[in-house]
């Protein structure tokens, strides 16, 4: 399990270092590509050697019980497996109402009108195949829109895109770095690209 951090002052580092003797599967990896969520994820992609790579934020909002079903779908041939809040068995607890509404509307419209095979377009809780990661060039410049970019590109390449239900729980400690009006234009770019997606 890779824990990617930006700088040595990150308070996550000493916590993970204390856990390593009990959990030797944990591995700290410093992000040398530049600060921010995008480069942290890119660092993880570069360092990971497994055939499938799961991305999850370290805020405890994503449901770890969904990981095994996601891995099963990936092993069955999916190149993208999304943890979806908007299918039967999934859901969301907490979070700003406007953010929830826009997220659900984006997922519904992309699924029904843009023919994206998943219902949750904005969650970053996703598993990717190494085949996909090695076969595309990342164009995202901000960060959180990366999941939508990779999903759209997988669809355009004719790869398998799947989803499993998951619950998202709003964080109980700390402060989110997600600022909707900052990230929205970056999401919108890939939102419109998705509507033009056709198999290559």
Feature roles, as predicted:
Residues 29-47, 52-55, 64-144, 170-181, ...:
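Acceptor/aglycone-binding surface of glycosyltransferases and processive sugar-polymer synthases
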Residues 20-26:
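Short helix-capping segments at alpha-helix termini
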Residues 1-8, 27-31:
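Short beta-strand/loop segment that forms part of the nucleotide-sugar
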Residues 5, 21, 113-115, 139-200:
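Hydrophobic helical membrane-anchoring modules
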Residues 44, 59, 129, 154, ...:
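Residue-level signature of catalytic and energy-coupling elements of molecular machines
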Residues 11, 15-18, 43, 69:
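Alpha-helical transmission elements in cytosolic ATPase-linked domains
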Residues 5-13, 60:
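A conserved acidic beta->alpha catalytic loop
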Residues 14-15, 75-76, 131, 189-200:
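Terminal low-complexity segments of carbohydrate-biosynthetic enzymes
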């Amino acid at each position: 399990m890779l824990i990617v951090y930006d700088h040595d002052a990150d308070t996550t580092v000493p916590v993970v270092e204390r856990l390593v003797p009990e959990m030797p599967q944990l591995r700290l990896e410093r992000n040398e590509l530049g600060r921010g969520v995008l480069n942290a994820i890119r660092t993880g992609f570069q360092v990971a050697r497994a055939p499938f790579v799961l991305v999850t934020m370290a805020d405890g909002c994503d449901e770890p019980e969904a990981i095994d079903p996601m891995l099963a779908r990936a092993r069955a041939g999916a190149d993208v497996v999304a943890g979806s809040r908007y299918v039967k068995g999934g859901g969301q607890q907490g979070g700003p109402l406007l953010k929830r509404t826009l997220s659900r509307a984006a997922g519904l419209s992309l699924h029904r009108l843009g023919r994206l095979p998943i219902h949750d377009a904005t969650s970053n809780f996703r598993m990717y195949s190494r085949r996909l990661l090695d076969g595309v060039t990342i164009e995202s410049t901000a960060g959180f829109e990366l999941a939508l970019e990779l999903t759209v590109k997988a669809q355009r390449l004719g790869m398998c895109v799947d989803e499993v239900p998951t619950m998202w729980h709003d964080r109980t400690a700390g402060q989110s770095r997600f600022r909707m009006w900052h990230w929205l234009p970056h999401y919108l770019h890939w939102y419109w690209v998705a509507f033009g997606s056709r198999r290559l």
